[in-house]
């Protein structure tokens, strides 16, 4: 089962970036977190990606590395990672060279998951518009396959942390072939639920819901090819 699953992963990512592909696969390099300037607390809860990898490995029978990898949008090693995560509480700022590199990476197979940890919405929307001025963030409802590809979230995006009583929303940016290049979750704070139990004192059922949705993100990416 594990061998077949990882073969599917490699094949899917190769198809996504066939023009000039991202060289890494999540099975080999794992997930990465994006470091950025602007003071937006990019580094909070460093355990969340390792915890997601552990959870995915336990339920998907995968073998993702349990690492906290950090990249900047300007780094050449960005192309080693097909899955990059960004979060924070405040301002994100990308330099022009970072915007260009990030655009190239996403067009060549990279996937960016952005989770607003309350306070980064305005700056993320501004900066991602610089990356893709010709594209829009499209709201995704529960009919989008990611919501039901592994665990059933047909009732909609779960609310993990309450900030200001707004409904949780998911948005996507797609390439010309309909491939999801960027997922942005707002007013839910999914990734806080991936933290260690002592970090936010979330009850087990809340953490499990967050990790299940994270598992859906991973499964959707590796099975869509």
Predicted features by range, described:
Residues 1-5:
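Positively charged n-region of N-terminal signal peptides that target proteins for export
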Residues 8-18:
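Bacterial N-terminal signal peptides
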Residues 21-83, 89-90, 181, 189-190, ...:
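Aromatic-Pro/Gly-enriched surface loop or interdomain linker
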Residues 62-72, 114-117, 135-143:
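Surface-exposed patches in mature extracellular/periplasmic domains of secreted proteins
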Residues 66-73, 95-101, 166-169:
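Alpha-helical scaffolding within the catalytic cores
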């Amino acid at each position: 089962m594990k061998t077949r699953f990882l073969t599917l992963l490699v094949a899917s990512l190769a198809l996504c970036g066939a023009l000039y592909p991202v060289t890494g696969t999540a099975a080999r390099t794992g997930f990465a977190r994006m470091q950025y300037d602007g003071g937006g607390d990019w580094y909070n809860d460093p355990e969340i990606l390792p915890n997601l990898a552990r959870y995915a490995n336990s339920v998907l029978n995968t073998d993702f590395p349990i690492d906290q990898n950090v990249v900047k949008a300007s780094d050449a090693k960005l192309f080693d990672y097909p899955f990059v995560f960004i979060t924070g509480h405040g301002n994100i700022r990308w330099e022009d060279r970072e915007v260009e590199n990030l655009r190239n990476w996403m067009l060549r197979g990279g996937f960016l998951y952005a989770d607003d940890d309350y306070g980064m919405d305005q700056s993320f929307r501004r900066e991602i518009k610089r990356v893709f001025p010709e594209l829009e963030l499209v709201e995704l409802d529960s009919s989008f396959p990611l919501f039901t590809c592994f665990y059933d979230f047909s009732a909609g995006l779960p609310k993990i942390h309450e900030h200001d009583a707004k409904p949780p929303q998911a948005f996507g940016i797609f390439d010309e072939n309909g491939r999801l290049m960027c997922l942005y979750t707002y007013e839910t704070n999914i990734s806080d639920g991936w933290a260690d139990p002592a970090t936010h004192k979330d009850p087990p059922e809340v953490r499990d819901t967050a990790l299940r949705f994270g598992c859906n993100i991973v499964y959707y990416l590796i099975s869509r090819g």
